[in-house]
From Swiss-Prot:
It comes from Akkermansia muciniphila (strain ATCC BAA-835 / DSM 22959 / JCM 33894 / BCRC 81048 / CCUG 64013 / CIP 107961 / Muc). Pfam families: Ribosomal_L19. The keyword Ribonucleoprotein applies. This protein is located at the 30S-50S ribosomal subunit interface and may play a role in the structure and function of the aminoacyl-tRNA binding site. Belongs to the bacterial ribosomal protein bL19 family. Signal peptide: none annotated. GO terms for biological process: translation. GO terms for cellular component: cytosolic large ribosomal subunit. This is Large ribosomal subunit protein bL19. GO terms for molecular function: structural constituent of ribosome.
Length: 115
């Protein structure tokens, strides 16, 4: 069991930007199409974080052309180039799945003043 933990520790990213549920973030993802590699940006609200260590993942939700789009990203994947925090949100829940049923201003998160 100790060997597994040691290998997992080697695979963890050291430069992960700290963020929480409710924050609006930009996830810069490396996309390989054919032989070319480019960066694709996915901006939205973090509605959930789960797991720990190498298994840690987070879910980001945005509204694109009137449709809700959610994407789950593993935190320590090499496909993520960087994560930028756009706004810090003030929420009282660990999971914001209730945002799925809300549209427009009703789905907005209050900005945090001190975080």
């Amino acid at each position: 069991m100790n060997i597994i933990n040691k290998i997992e520790q080697e695979q963890l990213k050291a430069d992960v930007t700290p963020f929480n549920v409710g924050d609006t973030i930009k996830v810069h993802t490396r996309v390989i199409e054919g032989g070319k590699e480019r960066i694709q940006i996915f901006q939205g609200i973090v509605i959930a974080k789960r797991g720990s260590g190498i298994n840690e993942a987070f879910t980001v939700r945005k509204i694109s052309y009137g449709e809700g789009v959610e994407r789950v990203f593993p935190l320590h994947t090499p496909r993520i180039a960087k994560i930028e925090v756009v706004n810090r949100g003030k929420v009282r829940r660990a999971k914001l799945h209730y945002l799925r049923g809300r549209i427009g201003k009703d789905a907005m998160i209050v900005k945090s003043a001190n975080r």
